[in-house]
A protein has these predicted regions:
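Outer-envelope exported proteins of Gram-negative bacteria
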Residues: 127-129
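Catalytic cores of secreted/periplasmic lytic hydrolases that degrade extracellular macromolecules
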Residues: 2-125, 137-255
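His-Asp-centered metal-binding catalytic motifs of divalent-metal-dependent phosphohydrolases/nucleases
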Residues: 131-136
Length: 255
């Protein structure tokens, strides 16, 4: 049986304020629909955004049909692709460390992931799942850290790691950010997601990848299946720990 483990306020919300909030939120969602789906798709095709898909052990350019299919909001998709990730959830350090077992350099850093969630209001299961995907379960070159001078720099979220020179550019970003330890890379990555995406209104995986409000700009990944891959990992943990999925949104486009 699923139970809600969202961090809740200490005082109950007055019903009138709650109703006003719902009305305001509904209006906000309506106002942020800037394009029809077809208009957004056209912008993705016309812009400079890179769209790839995995084929074997490499990434190749995605076809127009593949891109449109990945962009399409499907009821068969995991709800976690469309869930608000800006809300912390209650997890113990032991539970987070359990998720990180066998994950190379990520293993044992449950406390840092929980602190990153608390400091930045970023869902900890998302953070773990994203880091696992980007680092190949903590075993990529960027995850192990690249030495420059007397320091070693870590990057667990692929930040600044541009596809063709991912290791070089990702390490350069980590150096500029001062991520000289795994904990700094975890917290720095969470802060980046908060400031660059959540504060831009991109609160779920779909929005982070496709940015419906401003298509072909500020998109986290080039992989068209990036949201589905992270959602699949999150799904395993949500089921394992019996956590309720809250705040799902699937309407992004004008009719």
């Amino acid at each position: 049986m699923n139970r809600s483990r969202k961090v809740k306020p200490l005082k109950a919300i007055i019903i009138v304020l709650f109703v006003l909030f719902v009305v305001n939120e509904t209006s906000l969602f309506k106002n942020d629909k800037t394009h029809t789906f077809d208009e957004a798709f056209a912008k993705q095709m016309q812009g400079d955004a890179l769209h790839t898909k995995s084929k074997g052990n490499q990434f190749v350019n995605a076809s127009k049909q593949d891109i449109k299919a990945a962009m399409t909001v499907d009821h068969k998709d995991s709800d976690l692709m469309y869930m608000d990730l800006s809300e912390p959830i209650e997890m113990s350090e032991d539970e987070v460390n359990d998720m990180l077992k066998g994950n190379g350099i990520l293993e044992g850093h449950g406390k840092a992931f929980l602190e990153a969630q608390k400091e930045n209001d970023v869902n900890v299961i998302y953070l773990v799942s994203h880091a696992q995907l980007e680092t190949g379960e903590g075993r990529s070159a960027l995850a192990k850290g690249l030495r420059k001078g007397d320091a070693r720099y870590y990057n667990f979220f692929g930040i600044g790691a541009f596809d063709r020179k991912a290791v070089k550019t990702g390490a350069s970003y980590a150096q500029k950010a001062g991520w000289t330890s795994p904990d700094k890379a975890i917290k720095g990555g969470a802060s980046f997601v908060r400031t660059q995406y959540f504060e831009n209104g991109q609160l779920n995986l779909y929005q982070m990848r496709w940015n419906p409000q401003s298509p072909a700009t500020n998109q986290y990944a080039s992989d068209i299946d990036w949201p589905a891959k992270i959602a699949a990992r999150m799904e395993v943990y949500y089921q394992k720990y019996g956590i309720k999925k809250d705040d799902i949104r699937k309407d992004f486009y004008k009719k």
